[in-house]
Structures are given as C-alpha cells and as structure tokens.
C-alpha cells in the first residue's frame, strides 16, 4: 500500500493554488426572438452598439441595425438557415472591417472582401473599418489632374479629373458598364489602382467583365468586388463601402485610385428591402428616409488629398439606371446632386448607332475642365458648341427643303464630327489619337471625305500617325500641349494620309 504523506498533499494543493489564473469572460448574450428574410429580432443585447457585429450560434454574423426598447433588429450577412428561435446571440464588440492590401489586386472578392475567385486565400496584413469618415475640407485639394477615360466624347466635352465624382446615368442597355470598363482598360501604364464594384448583377455578367479585363491585361491593377444577385441584400448594400474602403487604403498610400459602383440603383433597392424588413418607416418611392445619406457618405469618400497626406486620390464613377429616361426620379436626382457632374447616355442615340451614346447636350462636368489637358482643350474648345448648333440645324432641316450652302456645310461638318466621336467597345484611344481625331474634324479635313467612309478614314489616320509620325505622339504624351512642332507634324500626317486615302477610295 502506498503511503501518502500529508506534507506532500499540502504542497500539491499549494502549487495548484499558485498556478490558478482567474480568467473571467463577460459577454453580452441575447436570445433570438424571430428570424427570417435576412433579418433577426434579438432580445437581451442590452449594451450592443449601432453597427456592431453580432454572432449567432451557427456561426452566422449579423450587424445590429435597429436598437429598440425591447429588442435589437440585426441584418444577417449570410444565409442563416441554421439559426433557430431561442438560440443564443453574442455581441462581439467589433465594428465591420475589411481586409486591405496589395494582395487584393487582381482578385475577385465578395461584399466583405473575402476571395471568391478560387485562387486561394489572400495574405493581407491590414484591415480598415467598412465605414470611415470622408476626408475633411483641409485634407483635400481641388481637382487638377486628368483622369483619361480613353473615350473621345467624354475626354473632349465632359472631362474627368482625379478625385472627381462623375455619375454615369442612362436606361438599361445603353452602354453604362462599357464606359466604365473602357476607363479601367485605359488606365494601363498610368499607375492607377481600379476597383470595380458589381452590385446585384448576374454572376455570368461579372465573369464576362473579369474575362474582358484579363484579356486586356487590366486585371493586374484591378480589384473586383462582387455582391451578386443571389447574395443576401445586406451584402449588396455593403459592397460599395467595401470597394471604397479598399480604394481608400491605396489613396492614403499616395496612389491614384478609380472606383466604379455598378450600380447604385440596385444598392438603394437592397437597402430599401432591408429597411422595410426592419420596419423602418418608408418615404418617397418606399425608400427609407436616410437613403440620401446612404449615397452621400459613400461618394464623399472620393477626394483628391493634399500633399501633406501624400497627394493620393479616389475618383468615383457611380452608375445609375433610369426607367424610360426619367432622371427626375428619387435616386437619380439624389445622386446627381451629390456628384460633380453626370454623363447622360441616351437610348435613342444608342439605337441610332451612335456609340458610346453620350448625350453631350445634357451631360456636364462641374470640376473637370480644370483638369483637362491643354492639348485636348485647345482642339476641342469649340466641339460642344458645334455639335449643339448641328443638332438644332438638323432638327430644322427636316422641315426646310432648300438650304443655303453655309447651312449645308455646317450640317456636313456636324455629321462628320459625330462620326469622330463614335468608338468601338473595349478600344480606348490614347491622348495623341484623340487630339488627332478632333483636330482633323474641327479643322475641316474630313469635309470632302464621304460620310460613310469617315470612320474608316479616322481609324486609318490614327494608324498612319502612330507608324509614320511617332514624334507627334511623343510630344503630346510628354508635353500635354499641342506645340507648333506637333501641329506641323499632325498637319503633314493628315495631308499625306488623305492623299493616299482618296486615291485608294
């Protein structure tokens, strides 16, 4: 029989008492009262914050949105099919955060920054709050650098600057996404990080966009945030903030960034759905009262920072879909009033074959003219006025039978200018190409070219200049000004090519 000495027992007890660490965890726990339609009503979360993350028993995460007297309304960021009435809910004490860093570039992530492209985990070291305050007045500087879209109609008449918010608005199937994708493709070699946020779109459409960007080599500097139509409404309304947060990280590192929200109409609809399910009082068109703030706090995060903060910028191109051209609806008017201008796409122009279908008459860029390159400003100064006069004359000429020679010439010039502004999808033009195309139209070099051959002439001319007059392109790219030497080279190039074109035609 083993004999146990009392002093040994007391020593063991003493050691265990000394090693004992009191680890008390206080957690804020509640109970699910009701769950369904992506919303959970929770009782007992007394100390929860507005916007705090809460965790359900099955691992689903939600956000506390409605803090009422007797319960908390939480929106679910997952399916939540395993959540049962009476199950526990724990407040995490954290606000929603998004992983950020260089590892995101070239990846496709969901509405919370989690990878969904099947390329494995991302090694991100930093994270930022999903909702963060916009830069203040002192932190900003005015827009002065151009953000070239590569689309002649936009860069010449509705210029965009780095740090600007420019709305792209139009009916469905008018080429809104095409303009955004062309702008991303045109940033190749410009050291701009692009973020494309797809909200409530079909997965096949997003896959098509990814394929286009990959084919054009644009995925190397682009992050795609996709909250697809099949995702919960909560993720669809949070996705734009995720995109802004990712771009913000690069902006505060001193980089130029471009964010495209495609589109904010669907985000507003997702937010309306969530708000109505939370029983928030509906307002105009059944949207909640804070739907303006939903978009203003997002778009105000786009800015051009001052040099003390690194001089980074975030340019925002939000997209809004109108119904039958009605820009006076609630969401379109809200976003028009928040942004620094709008590019209006007309379904009539689109159906008539003028693509991109930019309606220059009602499109405007409020701050972009300060950022427009001098070369474009010099050659395109008159183009908007000429097109406006042409549109007026065209309407008048339908009723008048005999037109004088000057009017006929003006109509012919206007038709050719319109041809210059036509552009195929996914083929943005460089700055020298835009300068050459507009210069040849404004200065009458196309007047004696048959209208049906004008587009072919411009395409051939741009190729000829790139191959035979490379110095012209170099001067425009480096100087950003149409110097006398560049103008001489351009005139020579146009004259030489025109002779060969007319002979072959």
Swiss-Prot record:
PROSITE patterns: ATPASE_ALPHA_BETA
Source species, domain of life: Bacteria
Protein name from the UniProt record: ATP synthase subunit alpha
UniProt EC number: 7.1.2.2
Complex and partners: F-type ATPases have 2 components, CF(1) - the catalytic core - and CF(0) - the membrane proton channel. CF(1) has five subunits: alpha(3), beta(3), gamma(1), delta(1), epsilon(1). CF(0) has four main subunits: a(1), b(1), b'(1) and c(9-12).
PANTHER family for this protein: ATP SYNTHASE SUBUNIT ALPHA, MITOCHONDRIAL (PTHR48082:SF2)
Disulfide partners: none
């Amino acid at each position: 029989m083993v004999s146990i000495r009392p002093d040994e027992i007391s020593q063991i007890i003493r050691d265990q008492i000394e090693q004992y660490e009191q680890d008390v965890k206080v957690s804020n726990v509640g109970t699910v009262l009701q769950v369904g339609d992506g919303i959970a009503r929770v009782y007992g979360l007394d100390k929860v914050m507005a916007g705090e993350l809460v965790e359900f028993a099955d691992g689903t995460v939600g956000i506390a949105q409605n803090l009422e007297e007797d319960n908390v309304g939480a929106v679910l960021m997952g399916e939540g099919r395993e959540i049962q009435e009476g199950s526990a809910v724990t407040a995490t004490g954290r606000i929603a955060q998004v992983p950020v860093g260089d590892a995101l570039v070239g990846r496709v992530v969901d509405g919370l920054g989690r990878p969904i492209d099947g390329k494995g985990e991302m090694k991100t070291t930093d994270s930022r709050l999903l909702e963060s305050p916009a830069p203040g007045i002192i932190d900003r500087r005015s827009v002065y650098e151009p953000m070239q879209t590569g689309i002649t109609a936009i860069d010449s008449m509705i210029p965009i600057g780095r740090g600007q918010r420019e709305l792209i608005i139009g009916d469905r199937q008018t080429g809104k996404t095409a303009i955004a994708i062309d702008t991303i493709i045109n940033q190749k070699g410009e050291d701009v990080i692009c973020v494309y946020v797809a909200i409530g779109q079909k997965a096949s459409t997003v896959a098509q966009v990814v394929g286009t960007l990959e084919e054009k080599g644009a995925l190397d500097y682009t992050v795609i945030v996709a909250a697809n139509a099949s995702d919960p409404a909560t993720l669809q309304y949070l996705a734009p903030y995720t995109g802004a947060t990712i771009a913000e990280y690069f902006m505060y590192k001193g980089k130029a960034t471009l964010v495209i929200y495609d589109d904010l109409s669907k985000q507003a609809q997702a937010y309306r759905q969530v708000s109505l399910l939370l029983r928030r009082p509906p307002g105009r068109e059944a949207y909640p009262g804070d739907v303006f703030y939903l978009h203003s706090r997002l778009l105000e995060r786009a800015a051009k920072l001052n040099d003390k903060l690194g001089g980074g910028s975030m340019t925002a191109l939000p997209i809004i879909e109108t119904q039958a051209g009605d820009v006076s609806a609630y969401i379109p008017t809200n976003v028009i009033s928040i942004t620094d201008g709008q590019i209006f796409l007309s379904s009539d122009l689109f159906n008539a074959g003028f693509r991109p279908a930019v309606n220059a008459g009602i499109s405007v860029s409020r701050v972009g003219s300060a950022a427009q390159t001098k070369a474009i400003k010099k050659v395109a100064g008159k183009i908007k006025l000429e097109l406006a006069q042409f549109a007026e004359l065209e309407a008048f000429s339908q009723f008048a039978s005999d037109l004088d020679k000057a009017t006929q010439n003006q109509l012919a010039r206007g038709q050719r200018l319109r041809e210059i502004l036509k552009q195929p999808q996914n083929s943005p033009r460089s700055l020298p190409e835009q300068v050459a195309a507009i210069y040849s139209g404004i200065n009458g070099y196309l007047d004696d070219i048959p209208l049906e051959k004008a587009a072919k002439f411009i395409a051939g001319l741009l190729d000829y200049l790139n191959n035979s007059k490379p110095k012209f392109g170099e001067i425009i790219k480096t100087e950003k000004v149409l110097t006398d030497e560049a103008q001489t080279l351009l005139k020579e190039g146009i004259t030489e090519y025109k002779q060969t074109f007319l002979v072959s035609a």
